[in-house]
A protein has these predicted regions:
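Conserved N-terminal entry element of GNAT/NAT acetyltransferase domains
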Residues: 381-401, 560-562
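Conserved GNAT acetyl-CoA-binding A-motif
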Residues: 505-527
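Donor-nucleotide binding loops and adjacent catalytic segments primarily
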Residues: 201-277
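A nucleotide-sugar donor-handling region in carbohydrate enzymes
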Residues: 128-181, 186-218
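Conserved acetyl-CoA-binding loop-helix of GNAT-fold acetyltransferases
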Residues: 488-505, 533-538
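A short, well-ordered alpha-helix in the C-terminal region of glycosyltransferases
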Residues: 345, 352-366
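Acetyl-CoA-dependent GNAT
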Residues: 423-485
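C-terminal alpha-helical cap of glycosyltransferases
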Residues: 365-390
Length: 562
């Protein structure tokens, strides 16, 4: 698969569009694909990041005000990519139509566009446009309605946040409690503690703070952040990423305080630097999601309008300390005494920092780029998820009378070959399992029938929250068995659809009492079981977890995406 990534960065645009495009590039290259990154890139930091990436770089002019796509059209004609992914707020809304047009003019002319998958990155309403695949990594995006625009593949929510491999590596080195326990043990050995090092007996104060307002801090938030730190009255070692006039303002903000300040230009491995500090103050752009993924206590501000929604959601989720009050604008960090109090508490209470780490790691799990790239592969194989009409199938709850038939279906050799456990199940073991299943609140066991008789069984199991993984108590994993005598009749999708409908109906409205309302359907499939893989790929299930050592891969279908 050949992938063309279109993005711009540097100067007033910041670096976020390019950084997350590079995360996708790394994942695509790791999957064995060829990648070209095209765009207008300014500044030594971005140039260094691009030079170090395992991709070809095509330098273009920035998007023209009149939406001139000709440079991109020429590049598509020359490279003939399988996937064109665009991460830009400035591209024309009709990008997909213009790029894939076969009517001549600015389009591809005589080239066949039918195999080109157009993918688009959006942040809520910013950069929104129709495409074959739309990625909105905004935390909580899947909870809000999105206007229908004909996009067949929607990847919405923070599970699709692309982060670079160095961030994933930093996450793997960390644990949920490392931010407090490990660092606190290190600090106890320090000989230069001050009077505030054990405030109110809650534990030791954080020593080191990093201030990084994106790759370039285009609106100059760093001085206000340093001023807030100075007003806490704590003795802190502060590293601030700032250049030029902004760096001078940062130094001025620290004068007369207990801060020991070090001002640096943007660094190549920001993930390593973030991991080395007790707390980071960040803008609510790309960096905040990297911090969540790694597990670093964070205080956050919003720098530009497209960051405000993410800022509000990450603060509400308890994954970051908010420094912008509802009455404050994006540039006004220095004037809110409540922000100083919140910041001081986070710096002096290790349990506050530990809670931030735990909440953040559940928002971003580091697999977003893999999920996007795997969906591109799926979109090429399945141009769009087929519409599933009403099927003459009814799923009903299993009854004791169904026990023997389900046992026989389970022990069928073909069924066992595709199961996690391929051993035969004894009648006594099955009967105990079946009887218990009928009364469990975390399992829904269904028998699916049509006018011809029993067609199979669908079982749903509630997936409990896993350490370090997003999701949990509202996700249900499916297991499908087609009646052996009904194989070869293309019943997989009707069975699955009937099972989804029955589960949604059974759990609807029970959130208050049981907390089991469906948020997502899950499927775990052996990667060598091509029929099952195809079933879920053509039923709008998206790749969610890579194959485990046993060769089982997880798919996910969000019940809330609109």
């Amino acid at each position: 698969m050949r992938v063309l990534l279109r993005c711009d960065g540097g100067g007033p645009l910041g670096v976020g569009h390019v950084i997350r495009s590079l995360a996708l590039a790394e994942a695509a290259v790791d999957a064995g694909h060829e990648v070209v990154v095209a765009g207008h890139f300014e500044g030594s930091f971005l140039q260094g990041q691009l030079a170090a990436a395992p991709v070809e770089v095509a330098q273009l002019s920035a998007w023209a005000a009149d939406g001139d796509l000709q440079p991109l059209i020429d590049l598509v004609r020359r490279l003939r990519p399988d996937v064109l992914h665009v991460d830009s707020y400035l591209a024309p809304d009709r990008l997909r139509v213009l790029v894939t047009s076969t009517g001549g003019g600015a389009g591809l002319g005589d080239e066949d566009p039918t195999s080109l998958v157009v993918s688009n990155m959006e942040d809520g309403t910013f950069g929104r446009r129709p495409a074959d695949v739309v990625v909105d990594p905004t935390f909580g995006a899947e909870l809000s309605a999105r206007p229908a625009d004909g996009t067949p593949w929607l990847l919405r929510g923070s599970r699709y946040t692309p982060v670079r491999q160095r961030v994933i590596d930093a996450r793997r080195r960390a644990s949920d409690d490392r931010a407090s326990d490990h660092r606190a043990s290190d600090h106890r050995a320090s000989d230069d503690r001050g009077p505030d090092d054990n405030v109110g007996g809650v534990g030791q104060v954080a020593r080191s703070v990093l201030v990084v307002m994106g790759g370039t801090d285009p609106v100059g938030l760093a001085p206000g952040a340093v001023e807030l730190l100075a007003r806490t009255g704590l003795a802190l070692e502060v590293t601030a990423i700032a250049v030029g006039e902004n760096a001078e303002r940062v130094r001025a903000a620290a004068q007369g305080s207990r801060l020991s300040l070090n001002v640096l230009a943007p660094v190549d491995d920001l993930a390593a630097m973030m991991s080395a500090h007790d707390l980071v103050i960040s803008a609510a752009g790309t960096s905040i999601w990297e911090l969540c993924c790694i597990g670093v206590p964070t205080a956050v501000a919003w720098a530009v309008d497209n960051q405000r929604e993410g800022y509000e959601r990450v603060v509400a989720a308890g994954a970051a300390i908010g420094l912008c009050g509802p009455e404050l604008g994006r540039y006004e960090l220095g004037g809110d005494e409540r922000a100083v109090d919140r910041l001081k508490r986070a710096l002096t209470d290790p349990e506050v920092r530990a809670r931030l780490v735990r909440a953040g790691r559940q928002i971003v799990d580091g697999l977003g780029a893999w999920r996007v790239v795997r969906t591109w592969e799926q979109a090429l194989a399945v141009p769009s998820p087929p519409e599933i009409g009403f099927d003459p199938m009814v799923a009903r709850p299993a009854t004791p009378e169904d026990s023997r038939q389900l046992w026989q279906w389970r022990n069928d050799p073909v069924t066992r070959a595709g199961s996690r456990s391929s051993a035969e199940v004894s009648w006594d073991d099955h009967l105990r399992w079946f009887t218990a299943s009928l009364t469990r609140t975390d399992r829904v066991l269904l028998v699916v029938e049509d006018p011809a008789g029993p067609a199979g069984t669908v079982r749903w199991d509630l997936v409990r929250e896993r350490d370090g993984e997003p999701g949990g108590s509202h996700e249900w994993e499916v297991s499908i068995t087609v009646a052996p005598e009904r194989r070869g009749q293309n019943l997989g999708r009707p069975l699955l659809r009937a099972g989804e409908v029955a589960l949604a109906e059974k759990t609807s409205g029970v959130t208050r009492s049981g907390g089991t309302e469906v948020h997502a359907y899950l499927a775990v499939v052996r990667i060598d079981n091509q029929s099952s893989m195809r079933l879920f790929e053509t039923s709008a299930y998206l790749p969610d977890l890579p194959p485990d050592p046993g060769g089982f891969m997880r798919f996910r279908k969000d019940a809330r995406v609109t």
